[in-house]
Amino acid sequence: MKALVTGVAGFIGSTLAERLVADGVDVVGVDSFTDYYPRPMKERNLAGLLACRGFRFVESRIQDVDLAALLADRTHVFHLAAQAGVRKSWGRDFAIYTENNIEATQILLEAVTKMPSLERLVYASSSSVYGDNTPMPFREDAMTQPVSPYGVSKLAAEQLCFLYFANFKVPTVSLRYFTVYGPRQRPDMGFHKFLRATILGEPIAVYGDGEQTRDFTFVQDIVSANIAASIRGVPGRVYNIGGGSRVSVNEVLDLIGRIAKRRPVVRVDSVQKGDMRHTYADTSLARADLAFAPTVGLEEGLTAEYQWLNESIS
């Protein structure tokens, strides 16, 4: 396998690239260091990879890089580059989401139509493509009705992947990630904010009553799903990738208190536009096709993120 990983300096991209390199895969990584969160964090994510012989890094946007040269001998593409964040996707900033999530994906898909060596393109989609009225657990064939502009952009890119499969036989596989957490998690994400505030003794903002639930998925399980999809994923298909259980924010706060041995201080804020009330993945299709099953439970994974963040702060 010779892989291209887009968004390689990010939370999931860097973790995936490290696993691939450890498995002996030749990896080219591309990232543009968007300013959504501080560049030094992404540089730390890359530090270990840059010392590896099986890894080469290119700093560029997908729209600007010479894709023909970048893809020349690649057999697999993992497309994780995206503009993240539900709450920032409203208003004028939506142009950034269309540019980085939709336009960049279409440009990449167009480029790989000229790649006879391509075995799989694995696209990082999101549970945000579902809506609040979706029956739980969410199945891949449920109606998609995003409640945020971010979700709309991810669904549009997912649809582009299917169109390029249907019309050009590009072997795309899309993975709908459910709330990914673990070491290197972005600073705007819930667990990172909760853990950091608890470590520093600061209040945690909880939006609403805290009874909203999520299907939390550890980053190494997401990495395993990507690798399985690159080998066994059925081209044209979409798979849910979840952690296997619904947990409320209040339950998470209790667990953080036990892990940190310090009771979190909570400040209740109003519910934010675009936040889904509940998410829960039906992963039976991924289990059947990819042999996917989550291996890291919430307490184990949250402890790993706590230890990483505690070391980063100190």
Regions found by a protein language model. Name each.
Residues 11, 123, 130, 178-181, ...:
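Conserved hydrophobic/aromatic "anchor" residues
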Residues 108, 157, 161, 194, ...:
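Aromatic/hydrophobic pocket-lining residues that form π-stacking "cages" and hydrophobic walls in ligand
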Residues 1-176, 220, 296:
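N-terminal Rossmann-like NAD(P)+-binding domain of SDR-like oxidoreductases, especially those catalyzing
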Residues 82-88, 126-129, 179-185, 211, ...:
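Active-site proximal helix/loop that lines the substrate pocket
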Residues 93, 175, 187-188, 235:
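Active-site loop immediately N-terminal to the catalytic Tyr-X3-Lys motif
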Residues 136, 187-195:
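A glycine/serine/threonine-rich, flexible loop-to-helix segment
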Residues 89, 178-179, 238-241:
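Short-chain dehydrogenase/reductase
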Residues 16, 198-314:
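C-terminal substrate-binding subdomain of Rossmann-fold SDR/epimerase-dehydratase oxidoreductases
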